[in-house]
Amino acid sequence: AEGYDPRVLSRIRRGASLGDADLQLLQRQRADWQRRITAELQRFDALLMPTVPMIAPTIGELAADDAYFRCNGLMLRNPAIVNFLDGCALSLPCQRPGAAPIGLMLAGLPMCDEALLGWALAIERRLAEA
């Protein structure tokens, strides 16, 4: 536990009470969800969404644990969905000059990295022209 940020460690410790049966059930449920979502998303080339759903807060705004955990969960929401699916994703910077940094996330199904990179290059070119 030494070396972990206390806020990260508290999340890791949440799983300490789970047993083998709990883990197996969660793995089966995740695999079922992955199969269903993959089947639904086959007809799309990519999913487009904000990399994070809000402008990043200042460090001072996250001093209290409750504010940190609320913001952290929100910031990880979109990428976490792709991670849970075992998908692939990337983020393209797309802010206007002088504006706060924002990113456009392109996400794809598992093992579709090459196709997703092709879409990213095309979108990046269009953004550069805008």
Predicted regions: what is each one?
Residues 1-34, 91-101:
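Short helix-loop capping/hinge segments that flank enzyme active sites or metal/cofactor-binding pockets
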Residues 24, 35, 84-130:
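Structural helix-boundary/capping segments
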Residues 25, 56-76:
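Short, surface-exposed loop/helix-turn segments at secondary-structure junctions
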Residues 36, 40:
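Short alpha-helical functional segments enriched in proximate histidine and acidic residues
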Residues 44:
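An anion/phosphate-binding loop that grips the pyrophosphate of nucleotide cofactors and donors
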Residues 52:
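Short glycine-/small-residue-rich Rossmann-like dinucleotide-binding loops
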Residues 69-92:
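Small-aliphatic-rich amphipathic alpha-helix that forms the alpha element of a beta-alpha
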